[in-house]
């Protein structure tokens, strides 16, 4: 029996999940979990990338302690951030987080020289200051000139493990530098940044064999012999693979630090309406496209908890939220002010004052405000997606950590007026494992993998119901008018 390990690292935590296929059912075991985050060093918010590598080795040593001497391994992480590699293969600096303030006004500055419509027509990717395109636009020229290669985070981890440099397509598409039609890094865009296209590794599809873990690591750590497979390395792409969807006319919501809501399509949509609504066409596994919108997500709730010194668990916060009427206060969760404020609680209260609303005081009221606002935003985006794609959405599959928040799932079902299915919470790791198993011939296809997922995990169901959607939507429109 083959053993598979998913290295799944999000913006706030990481984990190593051991998986195997037994009687057409996936069996999972969490082997190692660790925290992730950025710290302010050398003038920027930086990821502790060396510590992440150590955590991966710790996890693999735990796998070996289970008596497993050989395994297959795949890596997925958050998107857009990168590591600059020098001529000798060395890391030139710790990677800077997408939440760093260096890209403030970068979209405006770049698009004043290079029209938005032109960039969108080429790439089909939404405009966000965190995109790799804008990070490289403001990157230190000296570092860029010294860099032989630019590797996104999961590709860098794969490179450290195997010595092989690639640019996996699902994650590379999030950079806003891939040409949709040519399916290559866009030389014209890169020349505008004075970056040679050769600084990027060869594009590689999800499901491609990468290589063996280097002998040096096997000598340094007591870890299994691992064959590394390039999975859908963008965590959302893996989460969509791990969605237990069936049939047609469904949408997905990958709910975690970020909320990513969208549809899986066979072709991109980069027309004028999609451009106006700032929708993105990220590449998916096996020739698909993730037509989606980024929404701020549970980051806001995580920051409320941090400001409260973690006195309440997330479950307790949700329970407290249920004691108050929903939609008493509504915030625009995608307002840039909530990206990385000094104090999230103060920022929410200030927003409510500025928009003529009552001010949430307690942890329960604050959490209630955020969950209600998220559900409303989801419903509004589902409405827009139907208009843009011309496809009636009948089901929403919520996966990721946010799928455990029952009240958010129920609010979403009521506001959107469609049936909601929630779970599995570890969809990203599951999608990672499914791609590995397809590569190894244990699963036939992504469709077959989703059937296995449905048979392997409990999926929650939330029915739609009557709610004052139009009234709440009108109130939200008035709130936006204050901005």
UniProtKB/Swiss-Prot annotation:
Give binding positions for ATP. Answer: 11-15, 257, 302, 401
Q: What is its EC number?
A: 2.7.1.5
| Pfam assignment, any one | FGGY_C
**Superkingdom of the organism of origin:** Bacteria
| InterPro entries the UniProt entry points to | ATPase_NBD, FGGY_C, FGGY_N, Rhamnulokinase
Q: Name one GO molecular function term.
A: ATP binding
Task: Pull one GO CC term from this UniProt entry.
Answer: cytosol
Task: Give the cofactors, semicolon-separated.
Answer: Mg(2+)
Q: In what pathway does it function?
A: Carbohydrate degradation; L-rhamnose degradation; glycerone phosphate from L-rhamnose: step 2/3
- Please give the catalytic activity noted in the UniProt record: L-rhamnulose + ATP = L-rhamnulose 1-phosphate + ADP + H(+)
Q: Which GO terms describe its biological process?
A: rhamnose catabolic process
- Active-site residues (renumbered): 235
Question: Would the keyword Lipid metabolism be found if you checked this record's keyword annotation?
Answer: no
What transmembrane ranges does the database entry give?
Answer: none
Keywords (A to Z) from UniProt: ATP-binding, Disulfide bond, Kinase, Nucleotide-binding, Rhamnose metabolism, Transferase
Q: Where does substrate bind?
A: 79, 234-236, 294
The disulfide bonds in this chain are: 352-369
- What protein family does this chain belong to? Belongs to the rhamnulokinase family.
Q: What does this protein do?
A: Involved in the catabolism of L-rhamnose (6-deoxy-L-mannose). Catalyzes the transfer of the gamma-phosphate group from ATP to the 1-hydroxyl group of L-rhamnulose to yield L-rhamnulose 1-phosphate.
Name listed for the protein in its UniProt record? Rhamnulokinase
UniProt organism field: Listeria monocytogenes serovar 1/2a (strain ATCC BAA-679 / EGD-e)
- Phylogenetic lineage: Bacteria, Bacillati, Bacillota, Bacilli, Bacillales
| Gene of this entry | rhaB
